[in-house]
């Protein structure tokens, strides 16, 4: 069975909430292409784009993330529950920003 993006979003939200990580749906009127979620925990702010397995970010999303990273933002693309769990481990257990290379390219 293929997981839908909404299933991944539900899993993501549940896991982050259980860990005490603030998670907000990120919408920016007039600016398409921003990541889906903002995470805030222990003085760290991250942006996460959630995709169904096998789906790739749109070119506008890739360009927006490139501009954000150029200014020091931490942005990740996640498409599996394993990646959600890895992100949670890095934030809650390792107390470190995850390596962007451990996630899907964006």
What are these regions (language model features)?
Residues 1-106:
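Catalytic phosphate/metal-binding cores of nucleic-acid and nucleotide-processing enzymes, i.e., regions
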């Amino acid at each position: 069975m293929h997981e839908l993006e909404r299933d991944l979003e539900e899993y993501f939200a549940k896991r982050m909430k259980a860990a005490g990580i603030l998670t907000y749906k990120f919408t920016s009127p007039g600016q398409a292409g921003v990541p889906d979620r903002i995470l805030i925990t222990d003085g760290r702010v991250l942006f996460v784009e959630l995709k169904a397995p096998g789906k790739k970010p749109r070119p506008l999303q890739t360009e927006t993330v490139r501009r954000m990273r150029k200014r020091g933002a931490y942005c990740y693309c996640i498409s599996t529950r394993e990646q959600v769990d890895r992100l949670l481990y890095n934030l809650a257990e390792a107390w470190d920003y995850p390596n962007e290379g451990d996630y899907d390219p964006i």
